[in-house]
């Protein structure tokens, strides 16, 4: 975002800031807030009123890249202005200087993000080559901009926007020529851009949108319509609402199409697969295998060009399919993990995760009284980072907000929870009834547990772990179905977890008096 500036150039930055605010306000006048928020993000780099649900929908569908200022934006604005000047018989040099000045101002106005600076730099190099009567090489231009950006700030190497921006251009320049062909060109071009970026996506979002290739085949060709319509509408809206409403309609219609398309895709099984953050060895293996396939593609293309057409073409097509499948398997297939216990830092509250050696995952509580949006900012990132695709049993000790606030958000997110387990003696409390109602609305099975009840957890083969006398699983130690207490904390679900040689007791907020009684009994 543009910050307050002082000095001899401050007036320039202030004018750009005012222009962005004016165009953003114009969009709010000519269309609804949701559409205006998306257009402001795409055109002006202003995400201040971008709808969170739309942002999340675009992200899990694999099209969140359209919300950033990219090379497409720079090309449309810069090339349109450059061609306009050339039609007016302006010289190559003058057209280049004016176009570069416009693009640099646009970059500053939209926040001058790293990806924008990369795109602007490459555009200026392309225009400079044209002005000098030369052609430009995309990968060399990218190399120059990478050196410049790293020289300016070496820390951008760890910035996701830089990695995504540079990675996408590398994929276009190296992988696309080797994987695409006239038959199915658009599909394989989309695959060749998406495939090399999968580890980067998994490292930053911990999940992969498997249908992004197909979604982008529809989304990207329509982007110029959205961009041009939105830009014209924002300008026209400054002079009159009705012209702006007419001009924004194409953008509005396309964005609604995007929303419907993403909604339909997310209903498909496996639309978004939680992978967790891939470790270094899997990332190395991914790119090593991909490099091997690219060498094979290069040799096969050369053979096809030398006349071995029919047989070579079939083998080439098979190689591309196998390459895609193998690379996906490297990221999606995970080795069996050991038992794992994590006590999350939730502030004033409780949140405990446990994964049995068999792979069954449970969660106990998940709430905080002093951290807002705990589910979105703490619990969900933790689960996705660890590659946890669902929770088999989510135990609720009691219904105080510092134990269930995050769980409530997780339910709203649609994350997979098979069973929610609550104390039978506390099931009639108002707060607990509200939680049970929300769970049932989300089609989550609700189980009532009381003293003596247990849930057995078998290993992957279905057999019981005999390393311990007790069966692996969870046993309820307290309260009984008929127990009562004046203090709600003393009605907490007390659980004993057993997994092979490991066992532990989880008591929620029970008082020391109840603890002493349980020690005597057990």
Language model features by range: what are they?
Residues 1-121, 127, 342, 503-507, ...:
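Aromatic-rich juxtamembrane segments at the membrane interface
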Residues 1-65, 377, 381-384, 390, ...:
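Membrane-interface helix/helix-cap signal primarily in integral membrane proteins
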Residues 42, 70, 111, 161, ...:
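Divalent metal-coordination and catalytic microenvironments
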Residues 71-90, 123-129, 169-177, 229-233, ...:
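Membrane-interfacial alpha-helical segments at the cytosolic side of multi-pass membrane proteins
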Residues 112-303, 510, 516-518:
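Internal transmembrane alpha-helical bundles of multi-pass membrane proteins
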Residues 150-158, 263-393, 440-522:
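Core dinuclear metal-dependent hydrolase active-site scaffold
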Residues 391-402, 425:
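Metallo-beta-lactamase
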Residues 418-426:
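Short internal beta-strands
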